[in-house]
Every structure is written in C-alpha cells, then in structure tokens.
Amino acid sequence: MLKKIDLYTDGSCLGNPGPGGYGAVMVYGKHRKELAGGFRLTTNNRMELMAAIMGLRTLNEPCQVRLTTDSQYVRQGITQWIIGWKKKGWVTASRQPVKNVDLWQALDAEVARHQIEWLWVKGHSGHPENERCDELAREAASGKQLAEDTGYQP
C-alpha cells in the first residue's frame, strides 16, 4: 500500500525574469516538511515547475500524492499538454520548442514514480498551505545565496 502524501507547491519571481524561488509543503499523517530554494535569474513558471519537481524528488519511495498548485501552467502542462509535446518531439502545436523543456522532462520523470492527483487552488485566496508555500518561495527569491538556474533561457 502506497503512503498518502499531500504536497503543496508554489513559485515566485521578483521581476519575471529576475530572482526567483520555490516553496513546497509536504504533509504525511502528523509529519510536515517544508522545502525552499532560490535562483538568481529565472521565471515564475520555472519556479512553479521546480516546486513540484523538488517536492516529488524528496519522496524516497513511490507514493500516492495529492499535489495542490496555484499554477494552471503546471497542472495543465503535466496532465494535458505534455502528451502532445512528447509525441511531437518536445515541440508545441505551432512547431516551436517547448519552453522549460528541461524542467518538464524532470517533472515527467518524477511523476512516473508516483500516483498523482493534480489539484488547483486559486493563489492568494487564503488557502493556508498555499500561502505558506508562497511565503517560502518569496523568502527564497529574496535570499542572499541564490543558485544559478542553469536551464533558464532568455
């Protein structure tokens, strides 16, 4: 029987592009874990993706995950758009390269390990875990020791 995990994620970018961060809150029974990281130059969409990737990557074994995000980009991308992108060799319907392909491929690999239910919540609407993720992401984006987002392409 797979462990049931609630994973909440959010990304933030100050400037877009600019300094950015991700935040994730994981809940398993009475256990709670928070994750955050910041990057010098990135975008909000990259940080939304990174939050989901890092949250899933933290799980040491396959789990049943209920992942809640305020990003329609992430939720629709991973549940709908990615199917066509993969069939077409990672190009869009208009034959343009998929943006953030490095992170979409990383998320796809993490998703394959788990059973995931993707949920959307309106951002900044008072949802406690989403608000906490937003706080973690903004704090990370404002940090002094920001990593380089090597996959970011202007």
Swiss-Prot record:
Residues engaged in binding Mg(2+) 2: D10, D134
One GO cellular component term: cytoplasm
Annotated stretches, region: Disordered: 133-154
Pfam families: RNase_H (PF00075)
Statement: the UniProt record of this protein carries the keyword Amino-acid biosynthesis: no
Entry's cofactor comment: Binds 1 Mg(2+) ion per subunit. May bind a second metal ion at a regulatory site, or after substrate binding.
PROSITE patterns linked: RNASE_H_1
EC number: 3.1.26.4
MF annotations from Gene Ontology: magnesium ion binding; nucleic acid binding; RNA-DNA hybrid ribonuclease activity
Subcellular location: Cytoplasm
Signal peptide as annotated in the record: none
Origin superkingdom: Bacteria
InterPro entries the UniProt entry points to: RNase_H, RNaseH-like_sf, RNaseH_domain, RNaseH_sf, RNaseHI
Complex formation: Monomer.
Role of this protein: Endonuclease that specifically degrades the RNA of RNA-DNA hybrids.
NCBIfam families, alphabetized: PRK00203.1
PANTHER family the record matches: RIBONUCLEASE H1
Protein name: Ribonuclease H
Protein's organism: Aeromonas hydrophila subsp. hydrophila (strain ATCC 7966 / DSM 30187 / BCRC 13018 / CCUG 14551 / JCM 1027 / KCTC 2358 / NCIMB 9240 / NCTC 8049)
